[in-house]
Amino acid sequence: MRNNYLPTDYQAFIAKSRYAKYFDGKGREDWSETVSRYMTNVVRPKVGAEYNTSQLEQAILGLEVMPSMRAMMTAGPALARDNTAGYNCSYLPVDDPKAFDEAMFILLCGTGVGFSVERQFVQRLRS
């Protein structure tokens, strides 16, 4: 049985506005469709067809367990293309001009970037 009920209006708003995928002409997914997309694109390819994932799916639907919400949000082509989209944040020292390229790419994937501009790193930019 699929549970599409989220206990509070706030939870329903967050799930719909942050994690549900938008489809032209249909609108946004409901909670069960978001969970199904995650299971189809992230979990099942990793565990294989021989493993029954219905208990895990029901636990996610019932909010008993919660996977990476970034992975739930980007499950599908975006996450398959580059797993950077599955992370909340990243870090890099700014010690090479390429760090700026890397930071931009990571940000475009929707992942936050922390960085260090400590003297020992920044001095390497001059070389």
Q: What does each model-found stretch correspond to?
A:
Residues 1-127:
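Extended catalytic cores of very large enzyme megasubunits
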